[in-house]
Amino acid sequence: ISKAFDIPVVSGNVSFYNECAAHRVYPSVTLGMLGFCPDENNLIKARFYENNEIYIIGKKITKESNTGGSLYQSVFFDFISGMPDKYDIELEKRLKKTIFELISQNKITGAKDVSKGGVLGSLLCMAFDSNIGFSAKLLNEKTNNNSQKLKLLFGEIEGRYIIATDEGEYVEKYLQKNNIEYYRAGKCFGDKIEFDGYCFDLVKLRNIYKNSIKNALGE
């Protein structure tokens, strides 16, 4: 992967010692990497702006997709198992090239992968950091079983990204040109989190999220 993307890996660490009888540290490698951005105007954050359109782009959910190793699996079942989704280097290269080009053209204002919490978790993080709500349809009419719904909402699928833009028509044509699958999920506005029949108050959810460690410690 380092060679494919021409990115230097300058350090790495795997810890097997910071654990106790009740909890084990996952044997996941932590990598230190360096990057260079020649123009600070091309730096964007994982956030929304008022009236942004939300797109989910990249790999489609299939029967082979899974929620193995995901935050959803850890929280709801208190264990981690299964295999992560298959990594497609060629797709990732095409996706990143397209996203970087759109950023350099000032056509997208925010972007985030779904590697922590899946699509729903990533959307919530973007909303919390922006203090802007959203209204989205994340499940389509073809989603007819719970397994598929869980994958769409919580699957930490490689090759799936969320992008926010004010120029949806241009972005759609550019994605089509670069053979990138996309789905217009919704729009950013207000102080509510709305998706597929659910509605939550942004401020209340944000406070729960931001104060979770303090609350867990009983402070």
Predicted features and spans:
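Mobile "lid/hinge" segments at catalytic clefts and subdomain interfaces of large enzymes
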Residues: 25-89, 100-103, 158, 166-167
